[in-house]
Design a protein with these regions (language model features):
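Short alpha-helix boundary/capping elements
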Residues: 37-45, 79, 127, 142, ...
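C-terminal accessory module of base-excision DNA glycosylases/AP lyases that mediates lesion recognition
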Residues: 1-20, 26, 68, 83-86, ...
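Structure-specific DNA junction-binding interface
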Residues: 1-69
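Alpha-helical ds-nucleic-acid-binding substructure associated with the helix-hairpin-helix region
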Residues: 41-109
Length: 207
């Protein structure tokens, strides 16, 4: 049976985003800032916010509170973040890669498990984002998102592993495609379909 556009969106658009984010530390910083700007914001608003950030940097009206803390962290650490993530791609595979990328992106100030998972998804097509929409529609316990960054390394590793397991049960591509379909249905005046929602992940980022 021929697959619909929305069912192949991940395989068409995600590699474009991966290539962009992996190309340089500066591109990775843009990617992470897109993720951070999406926190408690409708996806349709993120593109304008990212453009504003690119124009005004730390002075952007959308970069405030914890989001400004994330930007400050990135300015100091994005080189090592990019190097570590690229090394993980070259040395790890499968679940080991998922866990390693989560450990890397969870270091970013302001990111919890869901947004770190979103970073993994955008950077490498791995893990995925279990946000509030996915919690509700998939009946996943909110405890899967709980992580205390001040907890012991062992405790944090267990929480990361539990999150990765929750994502792997659904597959990264499935989480992406069905989330895009859901957003398109929730905001039919903003989106043509799920494929459109998927496409703008790349369009927001591309120069």
């Amino acid at each position: 049976m021929k697959r619909t556009n929305s069912s192949i969106s991940f395989h068409v658009h995600n590699p474009l985003i991966n290539d962009y984010a992996q190309k340089s530390p500066e591109n990775l910083k843009d990617m992470v800032m897109m993720v951070v700007l999406s926190i408690q914001q409708p996806w349709s608003a993120v593109g304008v916010q990212l453009q504003d950030y690119r124009k005004f940097g730390a002075e952007s009206r959308f970069v405030w509170g914890n989001k400004s803390n994330t930007l400050a962290w990135l300015q100091d650490n994005v080189e090592s973040l990019h190097a570590d993530a690229m090394e993980a791609l070259q040395t790890c595979k499968g679940k080991t890669l998922d866990l390693r990328l989560m450990e890397i992106f969870i270091r970013v100030d302001g990111l919890g498990l869901a947004k770190a998972g979103f970073c993994c998804q955008l950077f490498a097509g791995r893990v995925g984002c279990i946000d509030v929409h996915n919690l509700r529609r998939l009946s996943i316990s909110p405890t899967v998102l709980k992580l205390n960054k001040k907890a012991s390394k062992e405790t944090q590793e267990k929480r990361i592993a539990a999150y990765v397991e929750a994502c792997s049960k659904r597959r990264c591509s499935w989480l992406w495609n069905t989330w895009c379909d859901l957003i398109a249905k929730k905001q039919p005046t903003k989106w043509r379909d799920g494929n459109h929602v998927s496409l703008v992940h790349f369009e927001y980022l591309k120069p």
